[in-house]
Amino acid sequence: VVFPYRGQEVTDFGRAGSSAPWTGAEFAGFQRSASRYSLSPQSLTTIPEGMQLVLASRNGSVLSLATGATPTLAGCLRNARAVAFSAQRSGRRIAIIPAGERWRSDNSLRPCFEDLIGAGAIINRLTGSLSPEAQVALVAFKAARSQLNDLLLRCGSGKELVEKGFAQDVLLAGELNVSDCVPKLIHGGYMAVSNAGHSE
């Protein structure tokens, strides 16, 4: 189970962890690290089954906690096909929201190439009419698909991660449709659900 947490409210993970409402949950570090649980995809590849993790961020977590009673799934390039299928079964109207990046220094928002492409990958697997915004995301994904890794490594946030030694994070996040996991927000935490809608 992954509990999204509003990152801008956390300045001391030790203090926040001691008062967290999720008994037994471990806090993932806000600073990207491959050696401990963090926002780095590499750090989560060996996470034990059944572990509870609190993941703080200023983009995806904030959006997740703002959806209220609306059924909410977490999608990306890795699980685009599975999430699209599950969303399509859940309702006729689907909103796909690229999270972007929230800057810690001034709280400003930066739209991200990789989030637009990820949204397009999910849209590519949906049927039905599309908004103009969805059409643009779909076109962007189709244009990028044949050179996905190269473009992800060369986009703004990709270059920043490469410079910091996290090129593997980019490549890992850029793997298309390699996961059937569908994370659904249930009682404040993302749990894996089957495409029939039942938690696993």
Regions found by a protein language model. Give the residues of each.
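Short secondary-structure boundary/hinge segments and terminal tails
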Residues: 11-13, 105, 191-192
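Active-/binding-site microenvironments in catalytic and ligand-binding cores
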Residues: 3, 8-9, 153, 175
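Residue-level detector of short coil/turn "hinge" positions at structural boundaries
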Residues: 1-2, 180
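Noncatalytic linker/hinge segments flanking ATPase motor cores
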Residues: 93-100, 134-140
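Long, charged alpha-helical interface segments
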Residues: 34-71, 112-200
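Acidic/Gly/His-enriched mid-domain segments of enzyme catalytic cores or analogous surface patches
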Residues: 4-94, 101
